[in-house]
Swiss-Prot record:
A GO term, aspect molecular function: pigment binding
DNA-binding region coordinates: 77-105
Domain of life the protein comes from: Eukaryota
Name under which the protein is recorded: Zn(2)-C6 fungal-type transcription factor pigI
GO process terms (BP): DNA-templated transcription
Location within or outside the cell: Nucleus
Family annotation (Gene3D superfamilies): Zn(2)-C6 fungal-type DNA-binding domain (4.10.240.10)
Organism: Monascus ruber
Length: 812
């Protein structure tokens, strides 16, 4: 009885809750009885067989004779049998391990079976030598949980054991563990105990979905939360990667996919001055003194309107040019907010500068100067009072902040929150048709600005992994009309009829994108809700999303680069932004069902759709990467690939990493698979291989790119070790098929540029070799661009690159 006294001491020390105390006491008492009954002088006491209920029934006069039908042996564990789940018949089975119910995994012993079930994983009788270890494991678990409660912290509901952190959850965990401990003593009692422990578990939603409460990180200098659909939360859900990458600065450190751990640390961008007070209070005259001569200002204004896609529909070009002329005539009489708007236009124009001349100062220096002047104009004009041009100036400033960093910045989201609240204060969430004193021109411009704010809110909130700030029920503002700036101005008494939907305008793009954003926002609301959505709700939103994308005008529908020969860079990028948003919405809607779909056919559509969308995302990433290289069609527009766009690529990368991680752990290397599954795995590896190349090149200037390169490189290395080298070489030579093997979801063929840049076993030219060694900083300037004449393939060259001098600038 000594174990009972020890357990009582533990209970008295760590059990402040009466329900928890009773659960723990019950657990240790039952475990102690089992130990006392089973463990003697180093051997097991004989057990009496369980009572035969059928024989007892025969002795009763009122009972009918027993059925002569032969009982079907139960091969699955008790919990899998009750839930009708697939069981691999191990001890414990994989399903119970994944659900955190390892200690509750018990089997009903058929008549005449061997006295003990052998644990195939350990090669020893389960429940005999393993019984003290189970009790010790349970004691350590409860001690840890009680320490957490005693420290005043609420244990996370996402920890593997127990299933939840409430007192009821502790009771269920204790009952389940006691049932496991009693399994070896009496099979009949074990079944009853396991059934009672599983009753409350059956009430939980099936299948066991991925965590929908997100991830929270609490550190000394920072506390951060992201929703479960954020790419970092998905990455954190891969346990092996979570342990390996506790710090994103860790390197992969293994061939043939070396991580960029030796690269220099990216510099921290400046924080938004308007949020943190990093500005000087100056007068209006001092602000005007920073204005450049008009010819140089004209050049910057022209640059802005030529490249207006980064900040569309904020400024009405016709009206702005009239006000621009009046400003040069009477600069001191111009409202300070309009001057801030002009500095915003000039700042973006300087950021867009592609060519530098002796007459134009350094554009980067101008960006810093004009960024400061925008803040000073907003402060002098008291932006909280919401004077005219306030929101327009703030939106230009928001675009400037997006260009300051290649990584996600929560400060930008906070700045957007200021803009949203000012827009609500100015009534932009109510359609101007309710207010007759607002002119048709002002009403239409308010609709344009509000549409842009709604879009920024939804996309930026998803980028930082938080719920959006604007709800659909709070606004009735109509869509802006498809009008050119030349169609109306401030003198218009009524708005003209809109242009046909096939006419490509900045407003057409905003309207088409916002219709997908509206469904995207509903998806974000559904998956960030505290109430778990039902699968029919998910499928209904899936259908709405597909219908909305099909309604996008044909000119904005994505098409291969080979069919876009006559289209400009602006049109190509608009198509790509829309299709990336569509695929991102698909991934966010379905990714929680990817793992359950492997054992439950009801969710096969979600897995196939999510993986196909992620493959599409990385296919577009590879196309965009190649077209923005020197000589590519989008090279001059490469700066438009902002952190908002890259966040979609991060999501696609992590989803395919999760898919590959499941294949690495669930599928034996020599397992027979269908051609569809093998083809899908090859597509996933090929897509991650291409994505790894992109992230590796960007890792010098982006922390997020470095983390993505580390993760994808680690998984690719493990995939190469597990599967046959011949299959991996086949992956290196393959191009994505035109049809996905899943559910008939089409995967577009790679462009000619993409196919030519894909890894193939051909002699490598010097630019191709440098593509895989950007972090090495090796000077190859004295070598020509002719082929090296090597017979090695890309995988061999990647392995060789580990011996290159990565920390030294050594000429070759």
């Amino acid at each position: 009885m000594q174990p009972r006294r020890e357990s009582g001491g533990l209970i008295a020390r760590f059990a402040p809750d009466i329900r928890l105390k009773s659960a723990v006491a019950c657990l240790f008492n039952r475990a102690s009885l089992v130990l006392a009954r089973r463990v003697g002088d180093g051997c097991l006491h004989p057990r009496s067989p369980p009572r035969d209920r059928t024989a007892m029934a025969d002795n009763s006069n009122s009972s009918p004779p027993a059925s002569r039908r032969r009982e079907k042996p139960q091969l699955s564990c008790t919990l899998c049998r009750r839930r009708k789940l697939r069981c691999d018949r191990r001890q414990p089975c994989e399903t119970c391990v994944r659900r955190g119910l390892s200690l509750s995994c018990t089997y009903v012993r058929p008549p005449g079976a061997a006295p003990e079930r052998i644990d195939r994983a350990q090669g020893r009788p389960a429940g005999v030598e393993n019984l003290p270890e189970r009790i010790g494991q349970l004691e350590r678990l409860i001690t840890t949980l009680m320490d957490t409660v005693q420290a005043g912290k609420t244990p996370s509901a996402r920890e593997p054991m127990p299933a939840d952190s409430t007192a009821a959850g502790f009771e269920r965990a204790a009952a389940a563990a006691a049932a496991a401990a009693a399994a070896a003593a009496a099979p009949g009692e074990a079944v009853d105990a396991a059934d009672s422990a599983a009753k409350e578990e059956e009430e939980e939603a099936a299948p066991q979905l991925s965590d929908r409460f997100g991830r929270i990180k609490i550190e000394k200098m920072e506390t951060a939360y992201v929703e479960s659909t954020h790419w970092t939360a998905i990455l954190d859900g891969i346990a092996e990667l979570r342990d390996h990458f506790r710090d994103e600065q860790n390197a992969v450190g293994s061939a043939p996919f070396p991580g960029p751990g030796a690269a220099a640390e990216p510099a921290e961008p400046d924080e938004p001055d308007i949020l943190f007070g990093n500005y000087r209070c100056v007068s209006k005259d001092e602000i005007l003194s920073a204005m450049l001569p008009r010819p140089l200002v004209d050049r910057l204004v022209t640059e802005y309107f030529i490249n207006k896609d980064i900040a569309p529909v904020i400024v009405h070009s016709v009206t702005f040019l009239r006000e621009y002329e009046r400003f040069w005539e009477h600069p001191r009489e111009t409202p300070i907010m309009w001057i801030g708007l002009l500095f915003g236009v000039m700042c973006l124009g300087a950021a867009f500068q592609r060519q530098r001349s002796s007459q134009m100062p350094d554009p980067q220096q101008l960006v810093r100067l004009y960024r400061e002047k925008i803040i000073q104009c907003l402060v002098v004009g008291k932006y909280a009072k919401c004077a005219p041009y306030t929101l327009e100036t703030l939106l230009l400033y928001l675009n400037i902040e997006y260009l300051q960093s290649e990584d996600t910045r929560v400060e930008t989201w906070i700045l957007l929150g200021v803009i949203v609240r000012l827009a609500l204060r100015m009534g932009y969430h109510r359609d101007a048709s309710h207010f007759p004193h607002i002119s048709p021109f002002a009403a239409e411009m308010r609709r344009r600005v509000w549409a842009l704010i709604v879009q920024f809110d939804c996309l930026t909130s998803a980028q930082v992994g938080l719920p959006r700030m604007i709800r659909d029920s709070q606004s009735d503002t109509a869509e802006p009309r498809n009008l050119l700036d030349e169609d109306f101005d401030e003198n218009s008494t009524a708005l003209p009829l809109p242009q046909p939907s096939t006419v490509q305008t900045p407003v057409q793009y905003i309207v088409a994108k916002n219709r997908i954003v509206a469904v995207f926002g509903r998806i974000c609301d559904l998956i960030t809700s505290s109430n778990a959505p039902s699968y029919p709700e998910v499928m209904q939103l899936d259908e709405t999303l597909h219908d909305t994308y099909r309604s996008v005008p044909g000119g904005l529908q994505m098409r291969p680069m080979t069919r876009s020969l006559t289209d400009g860079a602006t049109v190509i990028l608009r198509r790509m932004y829309i299709v990336l948003l569509y695929h991102k919405a698909v991934c966010m809607l379905h990714h929680r069902y990817m793992i359950p779909a492997r054992t439950d056919g009801r969710y096969a559509y979600s897995r196939s759709t999510c993986v196909a969308a992620a493959l599409q995302i990385l296919s577009h990433q590879w196309t965009l990467h190649n077209e923005t290289q020197p000589g590519g069609r989008l090279y001059e527009e490469r700066w438009k690939v902002s952190s908002l766009v890259k966040s979609t690529f991060f999501l696609g990368t992590t989803i395919l990493c999760a898919e590959l991680d499941c294949s690495l752990h669930k599928e034996p290397a020599d397992a027979e698979q269908s051609p569809a599954e093998t083809g899908l795995r090859q597509q996933v590896i090929q897509a991650l291989h291409n994505s790894y190349t992109v992230w590796l090149q960007a890792s010098d200037s982006s922390r997020e790119a470095r983390l993505a390169a580390d993760v994808s490189g680690l998984l690719l290395t493990r995939a190469q070790r597990k599967w046959r080298p011949a299959e991996m070489r086949q992956v290196g030579n393959m191009a994505m098929s035109s049809e996905s093997p899943f559910m008939g979801v089409s995967i577009p063929p790679q462009s000619a540029t993409m196919a030519s840049a894909a890894p193939v076993e051909q002699p490598l030219s010097m630019p191709q070799l440098l593509q895989f060694n950007t972090a090495a900083h090796i000077d190859y300037s004295d070598l020509g661009a002719e082929p090296l004449g090597l017979s090695q393939g890309v995988d061999d060259m990647l392995a060789m690159s580990m011996t290159f001098p990565r920390m030294f600038n050594v000429p070759v």
